């Protein structure tokens, strides 16, 4: 309806133009009138207007018949008629073709859809289109009165055609580009898309030049060595040889060597020894007997004799496995002896061996402790490496008291007794006879221990029918300090000596039995007591039983 109103506003000029041109007496009846309709610049042909159903000439005749009517009334009548006229007829009156809007929309949609351009934005092309559009508008506005106008539908058809030409150019260009891309794809090799396995003579390298100079050379520098040939001896003889080698039956026995149903353990070293002996069984067994590195089995392979020899060699040589192998176990290597030693230490046989070894001797160390491994590292009693055991508790302890400055039996003269006679033992004083009174009382303590000068020794007689036996008791009274208050014969006490300045030496007498001690004590005189000794230094009680 907006178009209708605009046409209504433009209708007075059209009517006036038509009135002047169609009135009788006017010369230009069949001339063409150019009517300007605003900025649209539409051109109308008068013949087309007259060809419509509504006759404008009749209206003009009526207007001429009534010359009394003013122009204003005529214009009003035309406007009223145009207002009552349908929109399609009004368009036809002004030169527009009536068309179906639905069909137009379908046709436009169908035409534009296949001709859609590329949706990519080209800035240069857009700028050119805008500039050209502005220039065209300027030229058209300046030449509105000079150039004839065309109908709106013809003008509207120009833009799609121009854009359609551009679309067609794009369409013409797209198949070409697709064709070029197809040719490029066809030019690519097939290996790029699908990988092939390179197998065949055409993929192998030519190494003929490298083999020309090696025809006369050996492939290996060292010659091959034959380790075993199964086609020389029968299988039964080979099994008997292995059985004798494993069981260490070196001498040939009458009858079959291999029991029935006995499984034979394979030994590659024994078979190799047989090959080196040119398949001589006896010679191979003789070599195996003296070759200790051939057969290597576990602990169960050691015979009872080898185990006893190893234990005896361990007593003699300790952990010197080289001497054990050379002197005791010649059928074994040093490595096998070491391996057997560590397996033997974890067995019950070692516990029994250690228990029997500790019964006869104990090794004395400065710290006063006994190491079990050091006990077993010694040798047998006849060997030179055997350590000397400690003195027996019944015969090995000294019975003479200690003194700092010994007047009769000093520590600096180990081989001389108090009476000037030489002693056969290396001790500072010989043993006392059992029938002599001891220097220290047995059951009585001094009455006044605080005063050393008032100390007097007490003499007790031994029992006549008691068997001679020595018992030594080292016990210090808890209420007395550990000091030495040696009293001189004149009764004046000497200077006390601190415990750190007193050294206690124990003489080793070896293994001396009671029968050896009695004749020794009877043959030598006793060593009298050199003087008074303090009980706090060493409370030594000599008892006879």
Swiss-Prot record:
A Pfam family matched in the record: ELM2
Location(s), subcellular: Nucleus
Domain SANT: 297-349
Record-level GO cellular component terms: cytoplasm; nucleoplasm; nucleus; protein-containing complex
Domain ELM2, chain residue ranges per copy: 195-292
Positions of modified residues (Phosphoserine): 11
Biological process per Gene Ontology, one example term: negative regulation of transcription by RNA polymerase II
UniProt xrefs under Gene3D superfamilies: Homeodomain-like (1.10.10.60)
Region described as Disordered: 100-189, 364-464
Keywords, in A-Z order: Nucleus, Phosphoprotein, Repressor, Transcription, Transcription regulation
Biased composition (Polar residues): 140-153
Molecular functions per Gene Ontology: histone deacetylase binding; transcription corepressor activity
Function: Transcriptional repressor.
Subunit structure: Part of a complex containing at least CDYL, MIER1, MIER2, HDAC1 and HDAC2.
PANTHER family with a match to the protein in the record: MESODERM INDUCTION EARLY RESPONSE PROTEIN 2, METASTASIS-ASSOCIATED PROTEIN AND MESODERM INDUCTION EARLY RESPONSE PROTEIN
Protein name (Swiss-Prot/TrEMBL): Mesoderm induction early response protein 2
